[in-house]
């Protein structure tokens, strides 16, 4: 059994995840040893959990557009790790999905990241990933972080969530698709084709 498979089994056996395991739901993440880019989002949505494949929804389609890549490269190249703040759908809240469970990333991220020694860039999608990895307040402005993404390079690239629910944000911030997305695509392509 590989080290990643051992970690996956430990995640599934953890009491915090017992209810998911009993329902036949496996944790959604990918941590190939060959990964060069790590994608850290909030947690799988309900559709991705039902499909059993991370980023297999409209948000994932938009994310792949932003990266300038296709599904085959995203899922099968071994160049992308996907290690969200929670590996299970946390449920619905008043204005969207509930936040990732506290303590989840602290417990599992270090073990998985140790297995991915070649990560060159980590995409931090949304406020929870950004607050955790950039050590900033959750209430900090995602927009400001994304606008000033160069301040976090070469290690991190903060992004807004690619959800269709963010259409209003996209309309209010046209600089994102005009300036940030092309920079992201260029950087991702350089890393993938080294």
Where are these regions (language model features)?
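Active-site and ligand/interface coordination hotspots across diverse enzymes
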Residues: 1-59, 185-194
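Glycine/proline-rich loop-helix segments at beta-alpha junctions forming the active-site rim
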Residues: 2-9, 16-19, 86-194
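Short, surface-exposed acidic-centric catalytic microdomains
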Residues: 53-100
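Short coil-to-beta-strand
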Residues: 33-41, 76-84, 154-157
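Short amphipathic alpha-helices and their capping/turn segments at secondary-structure boundaries
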Residues: 24-33, 62-74, 113-114, 148-150
